[in-house]
Amino acid sequence: MKKNIENFKIFYSSPLGKVVSKIIAKKISQNWTTDSNLRIALIGFGSAYLDLVNRKAQSFFLLIPMLHGLYHFSLKKNNLTASVNEYNLPIDDLSLDRLLVIHSFEYLNDHKIFLRESWRALDKNGEIFIIVPHSFGLWRRYYKNNFFALRTFTIFELNSLLVNNFFTPISIDYSLFFPPNNNYFFKKASFFEKVGSRFFNFFAGVIIIKAKKNYSAAILKERNIIKRKTTRASRVDAI
């Protein structure tokens, strides 16, 4: 798994990778406001998107999963790069406004723990952006063979994971509507993106989903659990 970092570096320096980064950056920017004083973190591999998400940020954390290996990024001195355990993020409670997850979610073995950690780290109105390979997309095989992704996702699976872990999906987008192994197609990528986004989401290579932290849902669930435990205890005492 540690060779993933090198695979990503090689990919994003290639002509295909540069086309992909331009397309994905545009998709991110359509849903990523550049408000000042935001506390932002990116987990995974996102060197091609640092300038986009780091703009005007109050603080920025670049979190690289330990299994990806080590890689040095030149960031502003008030920012932090760290190799992390995705299930135990070195981030204080309620200390992030945005979390971008790219080249990370598809390598996790336990998405529930990761999403609960993300929920903990995000502020009450925090948002999470997740970019993952699509199970039915043209890039599914490329992600598995070249990036060694452990799995791909359908939009139903993503929605279920987010909702069950106290996030509310607020926008869904699709991208990469051209096959990755054909030079002719990726040279016409802008055309395929325009047509594909209108008519062929089923064949999109990646899903981009944005969700908001559902703070009240988690509090309500906790109260219900406590209430049920109290009720059971009362019944036992009565017996």
Annotated model-derived regions:
Residues 127-152, 156:
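Conserved class I S-adenosyl-L-methionine
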Residues 193-239:
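C-terminal lobe and adjacent flexible extensions of AdoMet/dcAdoMet transferase-like proteins
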Residues 148-176:
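Short alpha-helix
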Residues 170-204:
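Conserved catalytic loop of SAM-dependent methyltransferase domains
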Residues 112-127:
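A short glycine-rich, Lys/Arg-flanked "PGG" loop and its adjoining helix->strand segment in the class I
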Residues 87-99:
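A short acidic, Gly/Pro-enriched loop at the edge of an enzyme's catalytic core
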Residues 26, 34-88:
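Class I SAM-dependent methyltransferase SAM/SAH-binding core
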Residues 1-34:
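Class I SAM-dependent methyltransferase Rossmann-like catalytic core
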